[in-house]
Amino acid sequence: MQPGPGGDMSALLAQAQQMQQKLMEAQQQLANAEVHGQAGGGLVKVVVKGSGEVVAVKIDPSVVDPSDVETLQDLVVGAMADASKQVTRMAQERLGSLAGGFGAPPGQPPAPAPGV
């Protein structure tokens, strides 16, 4: 492969390696970051890491009704969905600029396009 006009292949390779390193560091930071999701006006709260690991679930005792378990289940699902949206948004913000036009590291999905 021939370098572009005035281009230096070793400099291009070094730049690509540096970008990949920055992307991997950002992915690691994202995996360790925590987001808080909630539903029912804060009656059910969850804490989820960027990696998807659920760290905590907090349920207000007023929502616990043995005769209406479905409502509590819906609130937990809603809080998880809220946290999932926040993780996606955070990934777009942190990885989008780094991954734009640059392939993701092997085994990693490409970053979502901004505005998706």
UniProtKB/Swiss-Prot annotation:
Q: Which SUPFAM superfamilies match?
A: YbaB-like
Q: Where mainly found?
A: cytoplasm
Q: Which UniProt keywords are present, listed alphabetically?
A: Cytoplasm, DNA-binding
Please state where this protein is localized: Cytoplasm, Nucleoid
Q: Which GO terms describe its cellular component?
A: bacterial nucleoid; cytosol
Q: Which Pfam families match?
A: YbaB_DNA_bd (PF02575)
Superkingdom of origin organism: Bacteria
What are the cysteine partners in each disulfide bond? none
MF GO annotations? DNA binding
Biased segments, Pro residues type: 106-116
Does the keyword section mention DNA-binding? yes
For the region Disordered, give the residue spans.
Answer: 97-116
Q: What does this protein do?
A: Binds to DNA and alters its conformation. May be involved in regulation of gene expression, nucleoid organization and DNA protection.
The record's note on quaternary structure and interaction partners says: Homodimer.
Family assignment?
Belongs to the YbaB/EbfC family.
Name of the molecule in the record: Nucleoid-associated protein MAP_0317c
**What organism does the record attribute this protein to?**
Mycolicibacterium paratuberculosis (strain ATCC BAA-968 / K-10) (Mycobacterium paratuberculosis)
